[in-house]
Amino acid sequence: MKVLALIPSQKGYSPGQRGSVELWEKVLEPAGIHLDYAPFETQRLREVLHLAGRRGTKAVEMVRSYFGRLTILGKLEDYDAVFVYREAALLGPALLERLIARKKPIVYQLDDPLFVPYRSPSNGLFSYLKFFGKVKQIVSMSKVVMVNSTPIRQFAEQHNRNVWQVPSVVDLDKFVYDERDQLREPKCVGWSGSPTTVKNIKMIEGALRRISATGRCEINLIGSDDFGLTGVDHEAKRWSAENEVDDLRRIQIGLVPLPDDNPWNPYKFIMKTAQYMSLGLVPVGTPMASNTEVIRHGENGFLAETEDEWVDAVTTLLSDVELRRSMSRQAASDAAEHYSLQSNAEKIVAAFRSAVE
């Protein structure tokens, strides 16, 4: 089975792509399902897209990228199906998807609630060209729809009968659990994210200040070299793919604060929680989105909302090594059973094959 994979970003750059279709390739290829990637963005568009301003350059590169997509239509006969990650083009109506659907079955992956209007802080003007209503149309015209969270599945099932829920997965060949990590000294509380989510840590600055004042642990924050925290003794560093696992291994308790100021957040599958758990980090997270399903309060982690709840959860884990080790084992077991590439491999392959059945 030969599949043309239409992805928004160049391969290897987008966290969403890396944690889904690019990772799925590891189980699809041995099953005889070959992917040919076709990114929407040009190299120049990738460089400027998330910068403030640069409207002229963005507009030129958007047009160039869109016309590049049109050339794809002449190559469809070489493929058995077309995989669309989120949308065939970053802007505009579902024209490309409609033209594709007339010729080939579409496997559509929706891992964010693109149907909920949202104005990007760095691309406010272009947000008005997003055509949020097109998502319902793409879901309806697709042969297969793959989603990663329960709320998005509930939306998709209103418009398509062939919906497969596959969580954002962790590769256990890379994220290898070692129970000894929970015995490391000094103990470490930490967070990992990206520059766009650094603001999430500010939500729990008060709790971190109180935890830091106890002097009972290190605090490691990954994703930026400046988190803008006051009164919190911490180490800050940028995220890198090469050091991702080693950096996380230094942490025993993984923080997952989520703000309620983004209308997309309640729909999301929080990949970071699954990554923490796969390595045996005990998660402490906001009771929002997939955290309410993935984190089983008091069994494989804690849910925390108020400042006191954050402090109590973290300090309890710091003071009780047996509780921490027990929750660590359960977290790793749950991640392997439900949120790993290996445990979801058969479902991923079956979803793709259903496009041509």
Give residue ranges: language-model regions.
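Acceptor-binding helix/loop patch of EC 2.4 sugar-transfer enzymes
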Residues: E41-R55, V107-K136, E185, W264
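Nucleotide-sugar-dependent
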Residues: K199, E235, E242-S278, V284-E293
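C-terminal alpha-helical cap of glycosyltransferases
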Residues: L341-E357
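Conserved acidic donor-binding segment of nucleotide-sugar-dependent glycosyltransferases
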Residues: I295-D308, T316-E322
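Membrane-proximal helix-turn-helix segments that form the acceptor-binding/catalytic region
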Residues: F67-Y79, L90-Y108, D112-F115, L125-V144
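Conserved catalytic-core segment of nucleotide-activated headgroup transferases in glycan assembly
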Residues: K11-V27, D171-K174, Q182-R250
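A short, well-ordered alpha-helix in the C-terminal region of glycosyltransferases
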Residues: T316, L323-H338, K347-A350
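Carbohydrate-associated surface elements
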Residues: P151, V169
